[in-house]
Amino acid sequence: MKNTYEYNVTVSKVVDGDTVDVDIDLGFGMVYKKQRVRMLGIDTPESRTRDLVEKKFGKASKKHLKKLLEEAESITLISHDKGKFGRILGELFAHHIEGHPVFGHRVNVNEQMIADHHAVPYTGENKDLVEGQHMANREVLLANGTVVLDD
């Protein structure tokens, strides 16, 4: 098993529903800037694709992730490894201010994206194997009005 490390981070950019750029606080005033993090264990629809339907769901996932992160008072990254494209593979945890419904609890943002139907569990297998789960999420997001397809 690979070593895991925990850091306080500041999200500088939400790239898409499962990828963010962060500045990592290493302590002692040292910050490792603009590090790309691929959120471990999830897959979201692509927001940069020629498939216009998938793009709508991808943009909705990106927007939802941005909202989850903006609501947090602070964010922690648990890094697990580097992926095949050189990105950090990790889990993001949101910490909330007093008065927020989950104050005092550390929310795993990766898992929250799955619970909110914006992501599916994914461990690197062939993406065709999770396509059915993506389709089920689409139905939920259409039914609850999160995503509206134009005629």
Predicted segments, located by residue:
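Small beta-barrel nucleic-acid-binding modules, primarily SNase/OB-fold domains
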Residues: 1-151
